[in-house]
């Protein structure tokens, strides 16, 4: 999370879980962001290759992270080597105080928080969520006001540093930043038609921000 990076102390170690096998994901966009971080902030991002996401194949599932916090598995394994005291994740309010981005919950008392805070504690690490109280829209605003405003980009489907404009991330992150997207793409249409709507609060905001409310008339009463 670039927003989390901008809020955390300068001595924070920046690390990226690099999928190290052939897949649909393209790392050229994040790598350009890392280059900008080095040039504009004089900080380096530690890129650690991993095939961890293939573990799901053994269970008949698609490639992907095995749990909500598996994106930090590289840092858990290197915690002693890097002398880490904790690991921070860029989880926004849409997935903390708002359960699935739809309904309020007391996150501090939730099973999710108690379980994962406990698991990290057993490993001698603090479980840190620096933007747990900030919406995705708020996180985007933090990035817009930074030196990385032109460099930050969440798309992992683009090629040669250019975002694809067709994925869900492009819809709710690149679109609101004024970047060109295809709002009628198969993936965006599928997600907007899903019930319940994924990360509903932010999705509705993204529709309004881009004047695309007509794509989801079933939510007119919420605009």
Q: Predicted regions: what is each one?
A:
Residues 2, 6-223:
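Nucleotide-activated chemistry modules centered on ATP-dependent adenylation/adenylyltransferase
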């Amino acid at each position: 999370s670039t927003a989390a990076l901008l809020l955390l102390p300068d001595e924070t170690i920046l690390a990226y879980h690099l999928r190290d096998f052939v897949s649909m994901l393209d790392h050229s966009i994040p790598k350009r962001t890392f280059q900008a971080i080095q040039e504009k902030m004089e900080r380096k991002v530690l890129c650690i290759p991993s095939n961890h996401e293939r573990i799901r194949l053994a269970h008949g599932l698609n490639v992907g992270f095995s749990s909500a916090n598996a994106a930090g598995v590289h840092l858990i394994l290197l915690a002693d080597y890097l002398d880490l005291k904790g690991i921070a994740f860029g989880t926004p309010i849409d997935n903390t105080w708002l359960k699935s981005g739809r309904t309020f919950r007391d996150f501090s008392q939730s099973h999710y928080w108690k379980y994962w805070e406990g698991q990290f504690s057993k490993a001698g690490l603090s479980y840190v969520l620096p933007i747990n109280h900030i919406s995705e829209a708020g996180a985007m605003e933090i990035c817009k006001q930074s030196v990385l405003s032109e460099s930050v980009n969440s798309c992992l489907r683009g090629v040669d540093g250019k975002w694809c404009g067709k994925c869900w991330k492009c819809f709710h992150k690149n679109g609101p930043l004024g970047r060109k997207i295809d709002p009628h793409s198969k993936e965006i249409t599928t997600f907007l038609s899903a019930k319940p709507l994924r990360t509903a609060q932010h999705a509705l905001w993204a529709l309004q921000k881009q004047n695309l409310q007509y794509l989801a008339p079933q939510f007119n009463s919420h605009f």
